[in-house]
Amino acid sequence: MGLRYSKAVKDKYGDREIEGRATMTLNLPQGLYGRFNCKRCWFATKGLIACSDHYLCLNCLTIMLSDGNFCEVCGKTLPKKIVFEESPSAPPYDG
């Protein structure tokens, strides 16, 4: 779940990477000036989604997407498609 595309998307695009997807990082390394935080709430440090030049948590992103299509921090278009850089921590699927 999360790393595989649906059958319709795979039939449409094949195995090539889909353009325009924002990456969601589960654990970011420490930056030059400390930890990376959500620029809207300043509390979230995990599960951040890259906006144009800053990061947003999933909660703040959904709140901003319910208000409109533009970011309150930078004024650019909000990301709507997310790709996980690491696989989420879940038990392996035995099927």
From Swiss-Prot:
A motif (PTAP/PSAP motif) lies at residues 88-91. The keyword Membrane applies. GO terms for biological process: viral budding from plasma membrane; viral budding via host ESCRT complex. Myristoylation is required for the role of RING finger protein Z in assembly and budding. A lipid is attached at residue 2 (N-myristoyl glycine). A zinc finger (RING-type) spans 38-74. It is found in: Virion; Host cytoplasm, Host perinuclear region; Host cell membrane. One of its GO terms (molecular function) is RNA binding. One of its GO terms (cellular component) is host cell perinuclear region of cytoplasm. It is a lipid-anchor. Keywords: Host cell membrane, Host cytoplasm, Host membrane, Host-virus interaction, Lipoprotein, Membrane, Metal-binding, Myristate, Viral budding, Viral budding via the host ESCRT complexes, Viral release from host cell, Virion, Zinc, Zinc-finger. Its main location: virion. Plays a crucial role in virion assembly and budding. Expressed late in the virus life cycle, it acts as an inhibitor of viral transcription and RNA synthesis by interacting with the viral polymerase L. Presumably recruits the NP encapsidated genome to cellular membranes at budding sites via direct interaction with NP. Plays critical roles in the final steps of viral release by interacting with host TSG101, a member of the vacuolar protein-sorting pathway and using other cellular host proteins involved in vesicle formation pathway. Late-budding domains (L domains) are short sequence motifs essential for viral particle budding. They recruit proteins of the host ESCRT machinery (Endosomal Sorting Complex Required for Transport) or ESCRT-associated proteins. Interacts with protein NP; this interaction probably directs the encapsidated genome to budding sites. Interacts (via RING domain) with polymerase L; this interaction inhibits viral transcription and replication, Z partially blocks the product exit tunnel for the releasing nascent RNA product. Interacts with the glycoprotein complex; this interaction plays a role in virion budding. Interacts with host eIF4E; this interaction results in eIF4E reduced affinity for its substrate, the 5'-m7 G cap structure. Belongs to the arenaviridae Z protein family. This is RING finger protein Z. It comes from Parana mammarenavirus (isolate Rat/Paraguay/12056/1965) (PARV). The gene is Z.
